Amino acid sequence: MFKNTLTLSLALFCSFAAQAQPVIPRDADVESQVESLLSKMTLDDKVGQMCELAIDKVAQRSSDDHVRDNSSVVSLANGRLSASAVNDVFGRWKVGSILNVPEGVAQAPEVWSDIIRALNDASASQCGGVPEIYGVDQIHGASYSWGATLFPQEVAQASSFNKAIPYRIGQITAYESRACLIPWVYAPVMDLARSPLWSRMWESYGEDVLVNATMASAVTKGLQGSDPNHLGMNNVAVCLKHYMAYGAAVSGKDRTPSSVTYRELMEKYFQPFRASIEAGALSIMVNSGNNSGMPFHANRKLLTEWIKDGLHWDGMIVTDWADIDNLWKRDHVAANKKDAICMAINAGIDMTMDPYSTDFCSLLTELVNEGRVPMARIDDAVRRILRLKIRVGLMDRSTWDIPYGVKSAKRPKGGKSSKATNLANMYYDYGSDDFAREAVSMAEECMVLLKNQNSVLPLSMGKKILVCGPNADNFRPMNGGWSYSWQGDRADEVCRKIGKYHTFYEAIAVEFGKDNVCLDEMVKYDARNFNLDRVVNAGFSLDKLPFDPDVIIACIGENSYCETVGNIDDLTLSRNQLDMVKALAKTGKPVILVLNEGRPRLISDIVPLASAVVHTFLPSNYGGDALANLLSGDANFSGRMPYTYPRHHGSFITYDCKPCEYVETMQGAYNYEANTTVQWSFGYGLSYSDVKYSNLKVSSIPASAGTAPLMKGFTPRTAGGPRYAANDSIRFTVDVTNNSDRSVKEPVLLFVSDLVASLTPDIKRLRVFEKVPLAPYESKTVTLSVHPSDLAFVDDDLQWVLEPGQFRATVANQRVEFELK
């Protein structure tokens, strides 16, 4: 079969030819405020707006020694700051933003609000009426706010294949962040998790482009609301991160180089960012690494040409932690800090996260005066920063100059706290039981049943259960990093003080009865350090148990970690845990493996020994309750794998790889029908229901309306080839039937394979998915629509190409071929 590629005239310019308007519609009032403020600023004022410092820099501390992370002492009684430091930062340097968490640990909303009110007041009074903007890593809920509702981490959310979940998480996160007066969150993370070694895999929505784009767009809308020009009091500005290919590091280690072609960057890694920008995202944080020798912080093509000019985007770009310093200290592409600043600002950086130094301000001022950084570039950056502050409401003092106050015994009259005059009552539902119930329900959808031999699950009441393993009675691995502290190492301390959450063991004991459940961890993590694989035995005997168990639940995986601390060389699960499971299997009792890990640790030696395997990912504080509900059958599994789980070292591939990436092995060579050599495939998952698929059909294929020219663009809708209207779609129908007495939410995933192309196509790509609720014995005909241009690919000239020819669509065990003419 031969496929003709249409080679037509090339366009010379990037971006959407048809989209002349900004991706976020311009608002005349917002732009008028921006220009009015900018016109009154001196160069010092402008440069200060471009600087972001850590909270430690303005905190009350006991000495004048160099401030390092967590060394400062903030008085938690009243949020007291150092008056001299505050005056220096805002009065002298005119700093535009503060970030991070006082004392490195989550704070109560009344403490947060006292600190941010004080900072906003000081900065507004000394920076021409422009308050600073405070940024925090609120990754899976308001995770640095004491008593807020925490949700499953992003990789777990992706396993739900339900975009309503990240949308709702975004809404609640924004609400509870604004209760603390936090207006700007460094989320969502939308790095494609292409390496299973990567220490930040759990922060992403998995390995697939569409899942990342869909989930990140949903959470962006949940966080920011429907109008990016006018965020409400229940909304926060997002900061998409980390632009881009952060999860493609060749070594799999944090902040190490990637080697991705511009063609693949455009076709895959860029698309989730594009989708979220189209959803209204107001800011972006940059990848700390480099690609093929070019640091992302110095890459004008990616920062300015692709994002700002290509998408007509007027948002703001901020560095990651001290990354301008990395240009000269680590990457050696600049001789000194001044040259590094020049390089980054001219590439398109608008704000630098230079946490403990104001050198940026003086050096950038010198660069402008020397003519090395144009004043127009400074004005452009400051416009973007001011626009962000106006959009989030900071220029309206009434949005942040609000006392926290005391929460009323009853909700204030007027519906959703509309009559409240303090933060405690304005955000009456902060940390509420209603939010907790939603978190449990979400966590249930975010767990995946991977094995259920002889239907050992669900467990019947009355069984004697042994719960063991280092993750059995520990909030830290349940939550992961960015949970109350950077590494998540304060989670047990905080959660047990709050006192309303359950570990896996505690929740199972509540569900099945305390007399029927006992705990013997057998293996524990070493609490003395962050070494992930340093687990120590805590006794290894079944003889000490109060009863002879009917079933054993082994909770295994990883401790919490974040960023470089999570770097590893060996993906294999720790030897102590593997040996523990092997010893448990020798008892002859059914062993249920509960995986609680941020990335897929290799467990091929013990999977055959288990009767069941459940993946919980990082389910957070309500994960214990969710797991207990699923194990008992009170809830049904509906999650699917958001990444490919490897079986062996050296077989780290993604589902959308090229055909030649599969090497013939004892398990068989790849073809469209064969099984792969992975442990569990992307999209795999079981439930307690018997769901069958049938009658996959192509119900309609639109006719093309002529041809479109090839052009450099940033979305498949700019593809050259057959031309289709914006509302055209290829419609597929498939019958989905629940042949069981249990209701279920079934993720219906449609993959498409391009059978012949001018460049080697991926084996298959997920093109659309939908979560379909099915009552017992219910059957539904599900319609799935794909725009023809979504089948396009990027060629070596960075042009989207849609080639006519044969394609194959797959849903579960159903396949159908179709042709685009």
Residue ranges and their predicted role:
Residues 1-23:
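Bacterial Sec-dependent N-terminal signal peptides
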Residues 18-795, 803-817, 821:
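Glycoside hydrolase catalytic-domain context in secreted enzymes
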